[in-house]
A protein has these predicted regions:
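Active-site helix-to-loop segments that bind/position phosphate- or nucleotide-bearing substrates
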Residues: 1-183
């Protein structure tokens, strides 16, 4: 399993490295300058955390917000199906971690990425679209969050239909289902 995680990590690095060639278009930066690195899609990794969390770049803030919306949809679908969200197969099991939710999000991430990428390529941003926290993290202004939430309509029903299919498959293999059903 560790080898699979390593392959996934390398693939993600290559995937998001390709995003770095994409320019971002800005207006109003004469009055309110932005960091130089905001003119192109940056590294997926945050300089604050060394992970994808605590985004310091607008595109990462967009992705994090969109993934948060996806996580909510998948979590609702998992719980509604009567599955234990903490028992996953790819993401390691840790206290408080919803490993099954993260596992089931993986095949849906490309749809989120596509929506965000399409938005980034068509949108002209302004510095007011984002808010910098005292710690240096980049967050979405509420209006920008509304744009991202509108992208959610495209994926909202998908987690429920996929998890319904998984539940049917698990019912066909009762022993496997008993491993991941909530107690």
């Amino acid at each position: 399993m560790e080898a699979l995680r390593l392959i996934e990590g390398r693939a993600a690095l290559a995937y998001f490295t390709a995003w770095q060639a994409i320019p971002l278009w800005w207006k109003g930066i004469g009055k309110r300058p932005i960091p130089d690195e905001w003119h192109r899609v940056g590294l997926r990794q945050s300089s604050l955390s060394g992970t994808n969390r605590h985004a310091t770049h607008p595109v990462n803030a967009l992705l994090n917000y969109a993934y948060g919306l996806l996580e909510t949809e998948v979590r609702i679908a998992v719980v509604a199906a009567g599955l234990d969200p903490t028992i996953g197969y790819l993401h390691a099991r840790r206290p408080g971690r919803v490993a099954l939710v993260y596992d089931l999000m993986e095949p849906l991430r490309p749809r989120v990425d596509h929506g965000v990428l399409e938005f980034v390529q068509k949108h002209i941003f302004s510095p007011g679209d984002f808010v910098m926290t005292n710690s240096g993290a980049c967050r979405l202004h509420s209006q920008m969050a509304g744009f991202v939430a509108a992208l959610r309509a495209d994926i909202e029903k998908t987690p429920r239909s996929i998890i319904s299919l998984i539940t049917v498959l698990l019912d066909d293999h009762h022993n496997l289902r008993t491993l991941i059903v909530q107690h």
